[in-house]
Amino acid sequence: GAVVAVLGLFDKGKTFVLNHLTDAALPSGKKVSTKGLSFKHVVVEGTRFIILDSEGSYAPVKVESELSVVEKEMSEHFIQDVIFELADYFLCVVNDFTSLDQRYLDKLTRNLQNSNKPFREVIVVHNCKEVIDEETLHYVWESQVTAIYGSGTMQSTKVAAQDPLSLEL
């Protein structure tokens, strides 16, 4: 099956989104963070995938020596290189879309455009986990996508906090 990489900055909800897209049960939340790379085999609607869940980029670094930050950056670059070589498709998870997210996404997009990969687009997933109603969702979409990129269109929305019985948010 295809290899799908789930990328993004630290603490954006990559594993949370992955769990909801695939019905997986990987540990996620504020008390848990993915270390390095996590591989998961899933079947979604009859299609097999290998999911690469990555440690978020730009995570805080415990300073133990003068080289702590440099070593962390080198580790992140190595992991990104491995992911780039292995993955067929790339999901980039953002929540509040910041200029750092934009720079990260721009770098990934440029690398893909300059590669020989057959699918050279990044699928951006807006993890609006703090959004509690549809009005706020439309505001966030307008201010963080349409106002910035002009023609952004909402393709699909899944609110993870929706109660399945009452359908209330």
Predicted region positions:
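Conserved GTPase G-domain substructure that encodes guanine base recognition and part of the catalytic core
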Residues: 1-169
